[in-house]
């Protein structure tokens, strides 16, 4: 980082924060938000003044599920390229997942990732420790202050981290006093679906991306999620279900109590909110994700749950693969794709089309990830908090184009789509790291610190 962080005065921006939208000035100094007021006059001529008239000023987005592919899969992406894509999209903090090579299933391997991020990350960072069938002692040693969460793959996905021993899963729920998170799909159901479809189609080579939601079906998701949620209720564990993809699963989650009082929580991802099975004909493997993108009814149910409180956070599951890998035949193409650079504009566009208040998007992408994970002094525009902010121009449409993407994979399922709002400028810890389409200064990310309160 720079030896000293510049002082910025953002004038006349419209703040979208804590359920309100209002015009104010914001003073950033020493990497923190020093003051928020109706009108602030510069104290001296060293203050850099940013004119925010007509623009929205939001807390930096906290993306609580990303896969940045380092170590071991760095031809797809790495901590530098993908965190740069993050800040270009207004994402100032992220929680990265353990399915790298090697998988981050020990604290030693996890600390190596922290050390690398400290050198190169443009955004603030933390990492989840991966659970296996046999590493419960390591999981128990993970600090709730320094490690984001314990990640369980209850259904197979990229990497080799499947936790398929019921006794091991139950021990984790009962004995590990940490935030538990999970990818929930029932492996036997998916295997049976795959075998049946291969037989029906006359061979695996005849399967297409449109078969993905038939293999990774509603039944597979609900069986796994419902078992895990029942176990969490029985044991009293703090449990968060990643990328809920079906309307049926939403019935597992409580909308009646405040997030701060919930122990069982749910995430929806941008791609499940945007796309449906009707898009496979056009996009094919580009929208092959695990869990699968499902029906229009599922997508619409997830959208409704953004408003009623059953969905607590929105994340990306940003998971880059090369376009060459995605263009293989369906059964050989990996699942996942890059989304992080366009996630905030996409969600603001969705809000605009569905008449959802932008303040609700800020809650789901900024405030509530901070509350759920207990991230200290981030996720809100508050005096004294770290100066992680994003300035958005709501009246400057842009069309997603591959050459403008910073992800190493250089493609997006959103290519060709036009969004009404674009990210103009991003601050991380008080430093401008992105402005008008280009990275600025140098990586400024810091390690996230957690205060769970339990």
What kind of region is each of these model predictions?
Residues 206-227, 231-236, 286, 307-314, ...:
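His/Asp/Glu-enriched, well-ordered alpha-helical/loop segment
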Residues 13, 31, 54, 65, ...:
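Divalent metal-coordination and catalytic microenvironments
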Residues 55-120:
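Metal-associated gating/positioning segment near the N- to mid-region
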């Amino acid at each position: 980082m720079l030896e000293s962080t510049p002082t910025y005065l953002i004038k006349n921006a419209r703040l979208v924060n804590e359920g309100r939208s209002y015009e104010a000035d914001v003073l950033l100094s020493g990497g923190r938000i020093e003051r928020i007021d109706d009108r602030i006059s510069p104290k001296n001529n060293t203050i850099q003044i940013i004119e925010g008239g007509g623009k929205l000023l939001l807390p930096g987005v906290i993306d609580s599920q990303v896969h940045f592919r380092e170590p071991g899969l760095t031809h797809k992406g790495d901590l530098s390229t993908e965190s740069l894509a993050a800040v270009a999209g207004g994402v100032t903090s992220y929680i990265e997942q353990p399915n790298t090579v090697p998988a981050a299933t020990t604290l030693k391997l996890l600390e190596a990732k922290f050390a690398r991020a400290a050198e190169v990350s443009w955004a603030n960072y933390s990492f989840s420790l991966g659970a296996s069938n046999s590493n419960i002692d390591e999981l128990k040693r993970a600090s709730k202050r320094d490690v984001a969460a314990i990640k369980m793959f209850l259904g197979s996905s990229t990497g080799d981290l499947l936790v398929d021993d019921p006794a091991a899963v139950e021990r984790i729920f009962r004995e590990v006093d940490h935030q538990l998170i999970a990818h929930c799909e029932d492996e036997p159901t998916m295997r049976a679906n795959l075998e049946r479809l291969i037989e029906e189609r006359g061979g695996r080579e005849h399967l297409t991306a449109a078969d993905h939601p038939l293999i990774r079906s509603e039944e597979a998701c609900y069986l796994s999620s419902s078992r895990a949620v029942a176990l969490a209720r029985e044991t009293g564990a703090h449990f968060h279900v990643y990328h809920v993809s079906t309307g049926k699963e939403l019935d597992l989650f409580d909308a009646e109590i405040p997030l701060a009082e919930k122990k069982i929580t749910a995430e929806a991802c941008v791609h499940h909110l945007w796309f449906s099975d009707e898009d496979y004909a056009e996009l094919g493997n580009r929208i092959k994700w695990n869990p699968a993108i499902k029906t229009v009814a599922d997508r619409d149910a997830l959208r409704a749950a953004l408003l009623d409180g059953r969905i607590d956070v929105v994340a990306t599951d940003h998971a880059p693969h090369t376009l060459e890998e995605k263009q293989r035949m369906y059964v050989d193409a990996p699942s996942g794709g890059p989304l992080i650079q366009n996630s905030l504009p996409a969600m603001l566009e969705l809000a605009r089309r569905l008449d959802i208040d932008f303040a609700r998007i800020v809650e789901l992408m900024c405030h509530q990830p901070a509350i759920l994970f207990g991230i200290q002094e981030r996720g809100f525009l508050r005096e004294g908090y770290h100066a992680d902010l994003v300035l958005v121009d709501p009246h400057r449409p842009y069309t997603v184009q591959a050459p403008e993407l910073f992800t190493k994979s250089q493609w997006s399922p959103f290519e060709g789509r036009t969004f009404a709002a674009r990210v103009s400028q991003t601050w991380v810890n008080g430093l401008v790291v992105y402005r008008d389409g280009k990275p600025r200064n140098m990586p400024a990310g810091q390690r996230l610190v957690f205060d769970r309160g339990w």
